[in-house]
């Protein structure tokens, strides 16, 4: 990770995040995520929250696809999700579009690796 590579020199680095803070239960998706990792060895992180959100979208595409799942039908199902609300976090999934979210949060990293919003 960037923190390991830079050590204390990371102080003041600004990083863009494309998901909500994994430590703020202000949105339903973060509350669901925190409940899912509760009582596990998983610590809340931006990376695992992003994976959780992606898994929710993938699950919805599988549900909508129905029987006969294959690569082509899955691509079509994902592209067909359109504007998808995943627990208060909006995704915009369309054919040929690879940037599925317009949410960007800028955070600053402290010398000890904490993230400040």
What is each stretch, according to the model?
Residues 1-117:
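Extracytosolic ligand-binding ectodomains
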